[in-house]
Amino acid sequence: VNHNKSSIVAITETWLSSDVPDCACAISGYNLWRKDRATGPGGGVAIYVDSDYCTRRVSELEVDDLEVLWVTIRPKLLPRPLSILVVAVIYCPPWYNAECKNRLNKYIISCLDRMLIKYPDAAIYVMGDFNMLDCSAFTRSMRFSQVVKTATRGGNILDKLFTNCPQCYKSAVILPPIG
């Protein structure tokens, strides 16, 4: 993370629990925001943000049984029309049935609506491991673009990044998995 000078790092399937203190997974120079799976092992999401950036967890958007974490980020410099960055990291487990997937899609759309009303000039990034979730419902209705164009696992694009600001993003580079 430090080697690449990353500003924001989103992680899915952290496998962290409340037994693991933040200091055990801290990275120098970064603030850690995490949401562990509420029940059982596995899952979980986390975001590391450069500690020079003003960051706030948007806990009012969180739902206990969904593995989704939202943060707002205010870097020192942003292109003129942008006021703030909104970042969501999502883990959609492969065992989600159609009802769970539909609920997750509706939740994402609702949260995006709320964020766009509150921050109409925000650049929003929704990223994570979507497994086989059909994201067309929120990409069409919210006019979000999918940035990742190359397969991330096997022949499928499971790890995705959607944004309302594709011109602010370079082409995604697929790296080998960590761990």
Show which residues each predicted segment covers.
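A shared catalytic/ligand-binding motif for oxyanion handling
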Residues: 1-179
